[in-house]
Each structure stands twice: as C-alpha cells, then as structure tokens.
A protein has these predicted regions:
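P-loop NTP-binding core
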Residues: 1-260
Length: 260
C-alpha cells in the first residue's frame, strides 16, 4: 500500500483538487484508493458530497479509540459514489484535537497505525492535509511514503512552499529516513509572466524535487467540483486531467524505482 500526503501550509494552491483528481485516476485503473480528510474545514469531504455533521463517525473518532486495529478503524470509512474509492471524512472537531490531546505520548503515530491495519484493503491512500502544523499534519506526514506539495505558480505561493519545507526539516529530525518529496506546480498560465518566472524559479531552487511539468489553469476543475466528481470522470479529455495523468505516471515510476 502506497501512502501519499498532499500538503502545503498555504491554502488555495490545489491540494484538494490534486487529491481528488489523482484518486479518480487511480480508481479508474482498478486500484483501490482510500482518501483521508485531515482538514477541519472538510473540503475533501464536501467535494465528495458528504456533510460531516450528518455522518455517524469521522477521523476525529480515530483519536478517541482505545485500540486501533482493522475492526475499530473500518467503521470510520464511508464509501463514495465512485467504484474503488473510499473516504475517512473530516469533522470540524479536528480543530480542537491539539488542545484535547495535549501532550499525550504517541499521538503522532495514530493515523499510521490505522493505515497499517488497512494495508491489505487498499492499494493507495491519499491524505489531504490541513494548512497548519499540528497533530493532524504530524500524523499525515508520519504515515506517508511521499509528500506531494502543490504550489501555485505565483510569488506568494513560493513563500508558502518555503514554510512547508522548513516544517519538513523540523519533522525530519524525528525520522530515520528522509521525506520523499514531489513539488507539483499548479494553476500554471503560460500567458503570464508570474507563472513563467515562478515555474523557472521552482526548477532552479528545487531541481531534484519538482515535477518537470505543471498543471495548467483549467475551469473544468471548478465545474467538476460543483458536480462532486473527480475531473477525470467529468471531463476526461481536458488539459488539466491530461496533466494529472502524466503526473500519476511519473509518481508511479518514482515509487517503482524506490522499491527496486
């Protein structure tokens, strides 16, 4: 089972779009994918047409379990309307988790334990991270084989990337192995100087970690979200979906190389 976290400490860079679109493409390849919404705003859950206030359980309940195993974790999972795609939804109560958990030991590995228990149930897990460093982001990163960092191709997004990289450096100190990172340029508009220069700067500063291509601006992403569908199901031939197909192939090759 491959676990990817989609993270950036700046909002509006395409985290949820990246998560849903990749999940749609993975499910179309007949692979089982579990989505985990760790953001109290529950954007991923809402995208997939779930109202977390109306659900019997959410990710928050994972942190209330006395024992974490397959039998206790599976009730937190909801099936989406799409084949091979399930979700552990978020709830606004996640915003209180840092205060509720306090300094309890081992809380940074709860999600990893839960996903380890589900290892034979899914081929991929995609974790949509919150924009702030706290218990949930720590859990997501600790559980991940790779961190995908969407970065809007504009100057301010570069600042957000710098903060994210500092966060990863801090967390690296408690890991025995380095984070595998892939920076994903998003919302690219080749007509604008800002996009052109930002993409160039990304490739110069993070040459070995940035995906060489970019996800273009595409209104089909917005239209797909209104229909609560992955863009690959809504407009499979649009340029944005084509970019994510190329990205997924690239990421799969990276995983294969690392396992070789």
């Amino acid at each position: 089972m491959i676990v990817w976290s989609i993270a950036n400490q700046k909002g509006g860079v395409g985290k949820t779009t990246t998560t849903v679109t990749l999940a749609g493409l993975i499910s179309e390849r007949k692979k089982r994918v579990l989505l985990v919404d760790t953001d109290p705003h529950a954007s991923l859950s809402t995208y997939l047409n779930f109202d977390s206030e109306q659900l019997p359980a959410s990710l928050f309940d994972l942190f209330q379990l006395q024992t974490v195993n397959k039998e206790t974790v599976k009730p937190l999972i909801v099936k989406t309307q799409f084949e091979n795609m399930d979700l552990i939804p978020a709830h606004m109560s996640l915003a209180t988790l840092d205060r509720v958990m306090g300094n309890r030991g081992g809380m940074g590995l709860v999600l990893k334990k839960a996903l380890d228990a589900l290892a034979d149930e899914y081929d991929y897990v995609l974790i949509d991270c919150p924009p702030i460093l706290g218990v949930m982001m720590v859990n997501a990163l600790a559980a991940s084989h790779r961190v995908l960092i969407p970065v809007q191709t504009e100057f301010l997004a570069m600042k957000g990337l710098e903060r994210m990289m500092r966060t990863l450096q801090i967390m690296q100190k408690s890991r025995s192995s380095n984070f595998n990172l892939t920076i994903i340029p998003t919302m690219y508009d080749k007509r604008t100087r800002a996009s052109l220069e930002t993409l160039q700067e990304l490739k110069i500063r993070y040459s070995d970690q940035v995906w060489a291509s970019a996800v273009p601006i595409d209104t089909k992403f917005r239209d797909a979200s209104l229909k609560h569908m992955p863009a690959s199901f809504y407009a499979k031939n649009c340029r944005g979906v084509f970019a994510y197909k190329t990205l997924l192939t690239y990421l799969e090759r990276l995983e294969q190389d690392e396992q070789a």
